[in-house]
Each structure stands twice: as structure tokens, then as C-alpha cells.
Curated annotation (Swiss-Prot):
GO terms for biological process: CDP-diacylglycerol biosynthetic process; fatty acid metabolic process. It is a peripheral membrane protein. The gene is plsB. It is an enzyme of class 2 (transferase). It comes from Salmonella paratyphi B (strain ATCC BAA-1250 / SPB7). This is Glycerol-3-phosphate acyltransferase. The lineage of its organism: Bacteria, Pseudomonadati, Pseudomonadota, Gammaproteobacteria, Enterobacterales. Keywords: Acyltransferase, Cell inner membrane, Cell membrane, Lipid biosynthesis, Lipid metabolism, Membrane, Phospholipid biosynthesis, Phospholipid metabolism, Transferase.
Amino acid sequence: MSGWPRIYYKLLNLPLSILVKSKSIPAEPAQELGLDTSRPIMYVLPYNSKADLLTLRAQCLAHDLPDPLEPLEIDGALLPRYVFIHGGPRVFTYYTPKEESVKLFHDYLDLHRSNPALDVQMVPVSVMFGRAPGREKGEDNPPLRMLNGVQKFFAISWLGRDSFVRFSPSVSLRRMADEHGTDKIIAQKLARVARMHFARQRLAAVGPRLPARQDLFNKLLASKAIARAVEDEARSKKISHEKAQQNAIALMEEIAANFSYEMIRLTDRILGFTWNRLYQGINVHNAERVRQLAHDGHEIVYVPCHRSHMDYLLLSYVLYHQGLVPPHIAAGINLNFWPAGPIFRRLGAFFIRRTFKGNKLYSTVFREYLGELFSRGYSVEYFVEGGRSRTGRLLDPKTGTLSMTIQAMLRGGTRPITLVPIYIGYEHVMEVGTYAKELRGATKEKESLPQMLKGLSKLRNLGQGYVNFGEPMPLMTYLNQHVPEWRESIDPIEAIRPAWLTPTVNSIAADLMVRINNAGAANAMNLCCTALLASRQRSLTREQLTEQLDCYLDLMRNVPYSTDSTVPAASAGELIAHALQMNKFEVEKDTIGDIIILPREQAVLMTYYRNNIAHMLIMPSLMAAIITQHRRISRDALQQHVEALYPMLKAELFLRWEREELASVIDALASEIQRQGLITLQDDELHINPTHSRTLQLLAAGARETLQRYAITFWLLSANPSINRSTLEKESRTVAQRLSVLHGINAPEFFDKAVFSSLVLTLRDEGYISDTGDAEPAETMKIYQMLADLITSDVRLTIESATQGE
């Protein structure tokens, strides 16, 4: 580029460099989209806009991609590196420029015909200033229409710092030429497909238009389901129809979001400023799969795990910066206090009560509102656990909202609904101290402005945040596979509850929890906490801690928990240095070196972070525990031990493997543990390697408390085969509390009611107990003997003496 064009673009770039601060999506386009910079690249933009072109250029230069203003020279022909699909609107509409895109596409395809070695990568790119979806019955949706020069000037002036450059996966023109030919008709088709691509992409970025709130309420009131519920309300409460209708409107006011793009923009600025000071980084993985779903027109339901109140803001912030529409979020009614409630409502929150029981009008209004969100095409987010995890483990799912999601599908007419499980991880959770108090029996504080301000005042260094998108679950595909007759239940008016609904919802919920855990994120804090809590003194020398982290990292890298889980790329030493900056640990120096200590008062709190990744390490920990206690064991015996205990572990930690997969998992882990030198293999027997016994013992400690808990329940069951389920749960907790006091077990989940409830249910499902109350004494005692061999003699004595003293 030379002469007048260069001067023109330099002059135009002066105001843009001041007004525009754009963001690239994805953050590293060449790496994430697999662009090969050694091969020719050309860019395709939706319409002729020099401002868009220069904004694209800035991002290309920042990411070491070819300059779009530099033409491509191919076989002596000089072609522009960018193509505008449409000439774009003009201030003076009587002038209509000639469309150039088809000619340029044809020129490029023609070069591929004459040069079989040529392969140009065509990269569609859209540049957006502002993301306002607009209102129904309003003017044309600004982000979805092309802007002329004057309109563009005002858009850039006002929205230049809320702009992004969205790179799409490249299209190989070589493949196009080979599969479809190179004539002009193919060039026209290419231009037409590109137009459709950009229209879909913009809809995915801004979402459908927003209704006027009153219009939405009027539509809901006119629905047959709510009209019938209003009549029932009037009849059952002996009130007038108008009063019952006012009750319905009051419930809509309580529930419905009041989405505001301006509030999203303002909050984005505030959060961007805040995150940069509180977090050292927010790590996002597998966002491209969600962008593709949105582009393909799926109705997306985000289903994250729930660690903290911060989840609401963090996930919306991440989605917004991934070029996606922030979802409508189901938030607990406890958050509907001033000023948080009105703010959350404008950020897309709709509020849900803890229970729907006994209020048919409320459940009908909520279900119809949720169905309306789906039918209008808004993305939705809800926490399937129902509340924040106090232990750091996933809670058993609450299936009410999930059930309503499937019922919305049974109304017909919605786009394909896809559930997207999300793992959210932190190196510091601001509520973790409160969680520990609640687990010890303290009453949960009601959310309020003073409590919120108190929490905000404590925010300091929060380390790294992690948002990992798991494997999506298309509901239609799932139902087609598991309930082929589901379409027979479609009813556009009534909320249908076919016989298959409850078991199917339970199965989907369990699958979602497994997929959330599959996307787990190991980090410096949860790895260091796992190692230090494994030591009975909660302290290790720096060398021992480094060695233990190397063990965990090698296990996770060489035998990954799943393809969606993430492990830090940093070395053990770097992770320890980072964790020490979080001020959770103490370092004592002596003449030999550093000792890293987890203070007693911090130990209970740090179990939360250990539990975040307990599922990722439980299998190697269990194997290490079995090998450590037996000193030597055959592969077959090891597998028998693991298979006997696995159903309880799978239910408790939502593990991913089926029973038939265990043999290959055990083999892979045994090979890795042997490679690390922790064990040796002699005559198909696994032996402890005495020179690395400490590392193996610390690895085994990850399963120690779980095995002790199982031993308690199996001992009680074998001692009293006719014990009923509720008594078994209660007595197991009592013994666990005694054990935690006598043996210094600091984990709050050790005697958590939900953990024992889940365990007893699994024992019923596995046939150890039945609803008639009779256990299988021989089988129960066999498992207890196996567990008794895996726990220390003093713990075993405490468990067995607990029942003898009664």
C-alpha cells in the first residue's frame, strides 16, 4: 500500500486509535482457530466500512496475523487481502456501488484452478460496535444492520470502547475449489453463505430483541395455563378474578428480569476494573464450542457449579467477553434485596423461591415465564445444585428447574435446547469462612446490604479464576436416544408430566454433574492444599511439597482425568511460589531449608479447595492406599478392591467411568505410578518402593477420610443388619463426629449429612440394604474387612468400640 491510500488510512486511523479499544475473540485467534500464517490468509468482512477494516488491522498486527491492507501476491496476480461481502449503505442513497465480492471470490477460486498447490485460508471477521439488542416494536436493531458513514461515526464515538473483532474458523479455498469447482456460480454461493454466517453471528452476539416488560406480562396473562391458574386461585381463596389476576402480576414482578444493555455496559466497565485488581487472571477454556452452538441457533442453557455469589457476575462477564449474550440467570430470592436485587434484575437475573410447594399460581407463572424465555430465544443460566456448595464438592442436583426446561420442550416450538455444563473454580472464595461456620452448625446469615458491604471490604488478592465449559448436552439428541417416544407427550397448552419425565430428569441431572466435574481445573491453591492436608502435621519441607506436586501434576498430565479437565502448565516450584503469595500458608526457615506450614486455623478452610479437585485424584489415591496398606498386591486383587468400592465413590464424587472401564483406568494409573518410581512391579505384583514411600503415603492420604467414612457405615450395618436407613445415616454421622474429635480430622464434610445420605442411598442401589431393612451380613462384613485393612488400627478400634459401648 502506497501513496494516497496510505495517507488516507493514516488520517482515518488517528481518531480511531483514540476512540476505539477493541477486543479480539478468541483472545489468540491464530492459536485457537488453527490459522497457519505460513499459508496465504484473506479476510472477509460483512460490508464496506473502512473503520471496521482499520479496527481489524489493529487486532491483526497485535496478534502477528497478516496486515489486511497489504495485498496478496499469488502467481504474479495482486489481489486485496480483504473482501467486503456488501458494498454497504451510503449517506446519499441514490449512489449504489457495484458489488465487488463475487468478482474477488471468483478471482481467488480461479487462481486455485490454475495452481493445485495453492490453499488460501478465508477468515470471516465481523467487527461490532455496541451490543444493544434493541426493543420490540422499536426501530431496526442497530447492531444487526449496516451503518452508513455518519451512523458509524456516532456508533464509534459512543461505543468505540465496547467493540470486538470476532474471528471465525477459516475456510479452505482449496477444499472449496476441489469439492465445488471454481466458476462464478460457486463464487456467488460463497458470498451468500458468508452473508448468512454474519447474520447468525451477530444474532449470537446481541441476542433477540427485548420486550417491553408490560407487554411480556400481558402475553403471560393471556396464556391458557396462567388464565386457568388465576381462575383456580380465585376459586380456592374465594377472591375476585381481578384480585387473583393482580396476584399473578405481583408474582411476575417478583420473578421477571428487567434486562438493560446500558447496565451491562456499566457493570462490564466496573468488573473489568475490579477483576484486574482482585484477580491475577481469569482462565477460560473451551468457549469456542459454546460460540459454535450460539452460531448454529441453539437455545443455550448454562448449568454451572455453584461455589460463590461471585459466580453470577464472573460467568456473565466471561460470556460477554467471549462475544456471547449474557444469559437470563435464575437467582435465589434471597438476593432480591436493595440495592443488589434491582441491579441483578437489570443484569438479567430472574428470581426463584426455594420451594414451589403449595402455591400452584406461583409455579404456573414461573414455568410460563421460563417457557417464554426459551420461545423468544434468550439464553438461560441456572445452578443445578440449587445453592452454593459449603464443602467444595458438588452437591446432589435439584431437578425442579431442569424438569421445567424439558417441559418447555414438550410445549413444542422452541429451538433445540442444549445444556452446557460449566466448572467454575477459584483460588480464593470470599465466603469460605462463613461456609465453615455453617457446617459447624451456625445459622446462615440472611443476605443484606451490610453483609454485602462487609464481604466486599474483605476482598483482596483472589489469585486466579477458572471457567471451563464442559461437553454440551443437546436435549433433543438425549431424548431421542433414551425416550424415543417423547414427542408423543408434546402439548402446547398444558404442562405435561409423562411417566418418563422424573427418571429422565434425574438421569440428565446426574450426567450433568459428571460433565461439570469432567471440566475440573487444578490450580496452585487446590494442589498445595491437597498435599499439605495429606500430611498429618499439615507441614512439609519445600522439597517434599515440590515432589508431591510433581506427583499430582504428572498423574494429571499423563493420565488426564478427562479431555475437558485442565492442569497448570507451570512447574511445581512456580505453583508453590504463587500459592505462597495468597497468604494462606506460613514459611518457617531453619538451617536446612524452608518448611511450609498450613496453620491449624486455616486447615478447615483449606479443605474447601482440596475438595474442588478430590474427584480428579481419588482413583490414584485409592490405589495408593490399597498398595500402601498391603505392601504388595497383585493386579487382580487391586482391581477387585477398587471395583468393590467404586460405586460409592462414583455416586459421592460424580466420577466419570463406568464399571467396565475400570480395568484400563487402573492399568494406566498403575503404569504412571510405576513410572514415577513410587512402586515396583515384580511377578505381576505391585510393591511399595521404600525410597519413595513418603510420596506414595501422601498420595494415599487423599482417600484416607473417605475410606474411614465408608468403614463407619459398613461396620454399623454389619453390627446391626436390620438397621433402617435413617438410623444408619444418623448413627454414621455420630460416629464420624466422634472420630473427627479423637483423631483430629479437620474436614467439615467428614460428618456432613448429605454425604452419608448419598452413601446410604448408594448402598441401597447396590443391594447392601433393602427398603425392608435387611442387609446382606456376609457381603457387608466382607466389604468392612476390606476397609478395615485400609485404615489404621487406632481408627478401626474407635469405630468398633463406638457400637460396643451402647
